[in-house]
Amino acid sequence: MRTSSMMKRMAAMSLAAAAAWATGAAAAADGAPAAQRTIQVLSVKGGDAASPQAAVWKKAPTGQVALQTAFPGHASIVGTALTQQMTAQAVRAGDRLFVRLAWRDATANTEIKDTDQFVDGAAVQFPVNGKDTTLAFMGDPDNPVNVWHWRADGRTRNLVAKGFGTATPVPAEGLRSTATRTRDGWEVVISRPLRVKAEEGADLQGRRTMPIAFAAWDGENQERDGLKAVTMEWWQLNF
């Protein structure tokens, strides 16, 4: 068997396993019913939504997002993620979408000084094709996903993935983030222009709804890569 064929077969098996696991986990999850997995985007003409403490966030509807340990995509990285819930809000200001995430995290892990240290993080994910039929776990070769990944060490990355282990950084000059360490956790705002080039990820311009998924990493718990807390199913942004 050729290497390329073998890799495709292994990828297909992993995707099938992930889909089956996600279906079972979602059915067992004590999360919001499908009708409630919706976040209404607050549209404003102007103003500052970049700061987690901006006044506009007091007006934006809040979603209570349940998280669970992700499918173990890497056999060498296993464990149980700690974060079980986060709140999510969204604001459209001009030509940008701002997403605000807040969650509890007892320790602030903001730098890596040794090989056994990892930083806190969070991410939102969109299907590039805008369809909720896309696999919520990192997509697949035919249906990629776009990830906005914030890290507590100050890095914010725009990624495109086509399945487990395929997350690839792609240029996105307009992707920005602002984070605040609170008494008991993190508050983070990630934003990006609605319209982007095809190679930059999911284009949000002109959409009335958009599937969105969430993730969090607790560095103190050795969480990194595929060891993370995630949503089992897509949520929906309503513009």
From Swiss-Prot:
Reported uses of this protein in biotechnology and industry: Has potential use in bioremediation of waste sites contaminated with selenate, such as agricultural drainage waters.
Protein name: Selenate reductase subunit gamma
Signal peptide positions (record): 1-28
GO terms, molecular function: heme binding; metal ion binding; selenate reductase activity
Cofactor note as given: Binds 1 heme b (iron(II)-protoporphyrin IX) group per subunit.
Principal location: periplasm
Location in or out of the cell: Periplasm
Physiological role: Component of the selenate reductase, which catalyzes the reduction of selenate to selenite and allows anaerobic growth with selenate as the sole terminal electron acceptor. A c-type di-heme cytochrome of the cytc4 family was shown to donate electrons to the selenate reductase in vitro. SerABC can also use reduced benzyl viologen or reduced methyl viologen as an electron donor. This subunit accepts electrons from either a quinol-cytochrome c oxidoreductase (QCR) or a quinol dehydrogenase (QDH) via a soluble c-type cytochrome, and transfers the electrons to the iron-sulfur clusters of SerB.
The keyword Signal belongs to this UniProt entry's keyword annotation: yes
Co-factor requirement: heme b
One GO cellular component term noted in the UniProt record for this chain: periplasmic space
Residues annotated to bind heme b: H74, M138
pH-activity note: Optimum pH is 6.0. Activity is also optimum at pH 6.0 in the presence of tungsten.
InterPro entries, per database record: Cyt-c552/DMSO_Rdtase_haem-bd, DMSO_Rdtase_II_haem_b-bd_su
